[in-house]
Amino acid sequence: MVKSARQGAGGFWRDFKDFILRGNVVDLAVAVVIGGAFTSIVNAFVAWLMAVLLQPVLDQAGVSQLQDLPLGLGELVIAIINFLIIAFVIFLIIKAIEKMQRKKAVEEEIVAEAQPDPVLEAQTNLTDSINRLITTLENQQSSSQ
């Protein structure tokens, strides 16, 4: 009973290890870490953007900070700007990846076209061999007559 429980636990840990070592789980973990760091960068950029570009407008409107707008509109504006920046950067990254994938697909297609079809090549070799054999047999028959 104890031995089977150990085997079950070993199977569980082995399955867990296999799950963790899958490429997509590791990729997801890396993406989460990079996403967190990128969010910090975007937040700092938006804070700078607010200070440099929007603060003069807010001062003229009599608002000291964007967060002071009624009904939490300032935080909503900041969240929308953060979202738009992050969405734009992700869009650019996806476009770059798609471009690289298209380029790779074209290169693979060119390589595939350059390589002869092994089945067709084998059929050609067999046909040539059969034709040589027929010629040899015909020559032997004609020389024996």
Swiss-Prot record:
Domain of life from the UniProt record: Bacteria
GO biological process assignments: monoatomic ion transport
PROSITE patterns: MSCL
Disulfide bond sites: none
This protein's UniProt keywords: Cell inner membrane, Cell membrane, Ion channel, Ion transport, Membrane, Transmembrane, Transmembrane helix, Transport
Topology with respect to the bilayer: Multi-pass membrane protein
Locations listed in the record: Cell inner membrane
GO cellular component, one term: membrane
TM helices/strands, residue ranges: 30-50, 74-94
GO molecular function annotations of the record: mechanosensitive monoatomic ion channel activity
InterPro entries per the UniProt record, alphabetical: Mechanosensitive_channel_CS, MS_channel, MSC/AndL, MscL_channel
Pfam assignment, any one: MscL
Function, as annotated: Channel that opens in response to stretch forces in the membrane lipid bilayer. May participate in the regulation of osmotic pressure changes within the cell.
Record-stated family: Belongs to the MscL family.
Assembly mode: Homopentamer.
Cited NCBIfam families: mscL (TIGR00220)
Name listed for the protein in its UniProt record: Large-conductance mechanosensitive channel
Gene designation: mscL
